[in-house]
Amino acid sequence: ISVDMALTRSCGAMCKFCYAMVQEPQERSAIRIKDALNLVDDFAEIGVKGVSLISDGESTLSPAYAPFIEHCASANIDVGNATNAWDWDKEKIERVLPHLTWVRFTVAAGSPGRYAEIMYKSKDDTHVFDNAMKNIKYAVELKKRLGLKVTLGIQMVLMPEFRDEIIPFAKLGVDLGVDYAVIKHCSDDTEGSLGVDYSKYEEMFDTLLDAESLSNETTKVIVKWSKIEEGNDCTYNAMY
């Protein structure tokens, strides 16, 4: 039994592939530390074995972030974390990395300008890229130094207009020395709010194969072919 959740609804990024960008403004409150720790106790009592801090918000922004993960560790609950690493500073990394099972970093592109353009305001805001890479590199170094078993990876959410960043992204993953660099398609809603043109994915197949060929013994470049080939075809009849 596992739980997917976030410790806050706040996020400093402005990712073009994120559905939150087309939603109405919402309250961005964060859970209180005491409530977060009590929640862990409840999880342990009912037999929850794992927690994934994903979606909804950037959990690293919550004051409860490190205490929550440390308390999960004391309760023998595995924790994974998806993050942009912007606020994942050295102090937080040192506190939480020994207790995490996996960390998946959202990295929209391999070049600083395109990364900033896709995930923030403009191609000139490359400081967000530089900061994220600094934090990811430190996590990779700390993992090696302490011999941690945590799996570290980067993920690109591929929209057709980002195709120029497929190879730079794969090369970045190899340069960082993370365990994997995964490329997945962008999920749109039935109304096409994000404007994803699924017919364009097939044109990128050769480039995606080239990206996979950059894998080495340290870093596996992975393309989620099933979803990319599936496009916007639904495999279910109803959603509740």
Predicted regions, residues:
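Radical SAM enzyme [4Fe-4S]-AdoMet core and its adjacent flexible, acidic
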Residues: 6, 26-27, 31, 45, ...
